[in-house]
Amino acid sequence: MEQRATLRERAFQFGVGVMRIAPMVRGLGPEFVPVADQLSRAATAVGALLEEGATAASRRDMAHKHRLALREARESAYWLRLVRARGASAETLTPLEREAGELSAMLTASVRKLQTPRRT
């Protein structure tokens, strides 16, 4: 349970970090306004889905929420790469890109564990 709480907190902090850089992303040009919006949606969805999963009715439902959170984490990584390609500060983006990758790895492991039948 402790690891899940850590995962949820890290996902929350990831969302906060992305929300902090959203104005900078919008400032890259008018074509980046929708990118900032998509990045913000994807990054905050990771934590929201994990919160939903924490109260899942079943192990299968929790695995489903974690799979969706994984998709959102990977989408966030994509948008961050796109912003970096436009020349945004690596100093700002690198920690968020790293965290998106680490969250993806943690979520992949979590989904695998949740899909493994429990031994009674």
Please provide the spans of the model-predicted regions.
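Short, C-terminally biased terminal segments at protein or domain edges
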Residues: 1-120
